Amino acid sequence: MTNYLEFLKTKQKTHISSGFDINDEMLNSNMFDFQKFIVKRALKAGKYAIFADCGLGKTLMQLEWSNQVCKHTNGKVLILAPLAVVGQTIQEGIKFGIDMSNIEVVNYEQLDNIVVNQYSGIVLDESSILKNYEGATKKDILENFKFTPYKLACTATPSPNDPMELGNHSEFLDVMTRNEMLSMYFIHDGGETAKWRLKGHATKLFYQFVGTWSIMLSKPMDIGYEMTGYNLPDLNLLENQIITPKRQNGQLFNDAIISATNFNSELRLTKIERLDEVVGIIKSKPNENFIIWIKQNEEGELLKKLLPEAVEVKGSDTNEWKKEKLLGFANNEFRILITKTKIASFGMNYQNCNNQIFASLDFSFEGLYQAIRRSYRFGQKNEVNIYLITTDTMSNVKQAIDYKQKQFLLMQEEMAKAVNLNLSGSIMSSKVFDVIQENNEWYNIKRGDSVQLIQDLQDESIGLSVFSPPFAELYTYSNHIEDMGNSKNYNEFLTQFNFLIKELHRVMMQGRNVCVHCMDLPIQKGKEGFIGLRDFSGMILKAFEEVGFIYASRITIWKDPVVEMQRTKALGLLHKQVKKDSTMSRVGIPDYVMIFRKDGERSNPVKNTDLSVDLWQKYASPVWMDINYGNTLQGYRNGREENDEKHICPLQLDTIERLIHLYSNKGDTVFTPFMGIGSEVYQAVKMNRKGIGFELKESYYDLAKANLKSVVSLKSQTTLF
């Protein structure tokens, strides 16, 4: 038991500190108290992420972190930053009196020219570059700095509308790989090409986990510090919607919705109207600075003709030109800057400009947020005016942005709560619960962890065991670390499963069987990089054989591939895929019942004298074609809780009935370590056996208890008459 409890501790996801402690007096005197707190925390962790909103001094914090790492290691630190930010970062270092002799600041594009093993520390400025998890840049960063002892990631928006992107930071900081994080905290929402989202049960635990290796704040108050000097000015979001000329679309009005496919063509069709609106706004404020954000090069060309004094920074410009003009605007060398968000929306400080115009809005919340934050940041003295030029044909773009903003604010709120919990040391790995039991002459059921509860069963007391184990990462039942479904990968699942089946071998009578219901599992391209099947039944077979069971038989249960296709939208089952490239097609995935036997003396054999030849031939078929998938205990949906995800439907009573009939005697004890809503125990009691069942999830346990009371009541009525 001690080994098992130690294993459970390893499932509690925390970040192990690998850094060093430092006193406030040793830090740069220009820092605010909250900044010193963050830098000390990052230095102690060794590998850390700072998700601080714009204007909170990320540049100063990363420079001082780098300075202290240089002193501690007597080595060098590399800061990777967007091109336009490199110059500002160096200027900030000089401004605050930081020794830059061992701190090198270069842009991401120079990564191929860097000898990485010369650095003791690495800083990723605007680390949201990691969001492109399949990109070459991310791959190079992960590989090149894998063995760098000190790492820091800094950005304002780690994941504006997709918390999964936080996993890229986790992987960079050597906390948990992206695939491990997907298995532990995320679920694949139908189909083999669908996206991943946070499991309902995992939301709180995920943000608490992130809070062990990062800090997120939108203001100092989020981590308990005073707001003196950190009050933002008013932000005016001014939407100017243009009604476009009527088009020949066969409808009374123009289409109000666009997609990513026709987005660029729509911009070209509305270019004149939108840019005329831009020019009108700028001419109304002839003495004020403006940033104009565009999407297409043609927009920049036309604006340059309409506004000759403006300076445009394009992607095709030389690095020297970009750097000179982006810094020049910050230094008030000209008053109108035309550029794209992908060029200048990260890292630049444009407090000298309180007017921005989005000449063309797209679906990217992060681009919009980062661009606005160039001007709307702590330290800005004037109210900020953001002009959003939209058209009646692109109404869904603004709706998408609004939705993503809500997601971002939710993430900020959850992260702030988790960080505060972590700061006070009050994070719990699992909800504490008491074991609940219901015991009578027909059944003994308990609510709790089956690995711990099975310790109380007597040696060789079980005549038959029937169960369907948690399918590793496929389904999620609860937020407990004891839940085998909450595993970061299959190795972790099998390690925990092994603790159970060792005990199962002990409690099984000699010569008796364990029946495991399972299936092979689909591999999603979005997670593994390819589409295929995982041999889950093979993993179970290997695990049982390793503890001493004999692999005795396998029953295949037919399932309708049409139903599977409609439910999962699996690429391999789609008819259009057969016509496109049938090498990617596959058959439906059947269920299996794996039969394992404990060898030894057969002092109490199972003699099925009532089993007819016809029925035996039906049971002996290697494929059971006639299992009624609708014949299950009803009401299992009532056992679902608010945050529950997908669940395996209860095991079919037909299957359980045949296994109990074939492999046990009346009066035997039938055991299931994963009781669910009580199907195996229910059928055992109905067939005059005693049932023992364990279930971790309270709502399922309560439903099982009700189901078992009903079958006992039914037996009493049958006996009475």
Model regions: which residues?
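A conserved SF2-helicase RecA2
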Residues: 363-432
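Conserved Walker A/P-loop ATP-binding site and its immediately adjacent core
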Residues: 59-64, 74-93, 160-165, 295-297
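Walker A/P-loop
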Residues: 45-65, 671-683
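Core catalytic lobe of class I
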Residues: 351, 440-703
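Conserved pre-motif I regulatory segment
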Residues: 11-50
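Conserved P-loop NTPase motor "coupling/switch" region that bridges the ATPase
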Residues: 75-76, 121, 138-222, 380
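Conserved helicase ATPase core of P-loop NTP-dependent helicases/translocases
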Residues: 291-293, 301-302, 308-344
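Conserved interdomain hinge at the start of the Helicase C-terminal
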Residues: 266-295
